[in-house]
Amino acid sequence: MTNRLSFEMEKDLLIKGWMSHDARWFMAVAERFGIDAANRLNQLVCRELGRVEMKRYMKTLGLSPAKDLEEFLILGKAALTLYGSGLAEYEIKTLNHQTYEMHLKRCFAYENIVRAGIKDQYECGILARIQGWIDAQGLEHELAPPLGKCMMVLGKECRYSITLHFH
């Protein structure tokens, strides 16, 4: 074979493959057990996946948990680039020494639930994954608003305020 994939092409294919698996898993659970069960399990699995992938990421790079918001945001942005490249467009705004706001301007999950025709029943799993990244660092946090229905479906901007409690 003469054509070789670049690293970015390989990463893109792996991410898209995983997201295809994720969507099909969600729909299979929804069809078999109902949308409420699919939402509950999706949030649980996304949070646990986030915890595991952040622990693995930190171990691979020899990193310790973040000591302050600046370190946390640097680590989070790097993880988003690795695990979610091209899946969302977002802005991060620091509100104070322990709180930041995440504004998702474009979200693959929203785009896919609209295509799948389940937008009115879907509950956000994206922020659950980020909560897992927080859990992996042993941090307590507050999320406002709490997870629930997709904010974009509700006609709102997808904005979450996350307050971290560093030790």
Task: Tell where the protein language model's regions lie, with residue ranges.
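A conserved amphipathic terminal alpha-helix motif
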Residues: Y122-D135
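N-terminal accessory segment detector
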Residues: M1-T99, F108-C124, E140, P145-H167
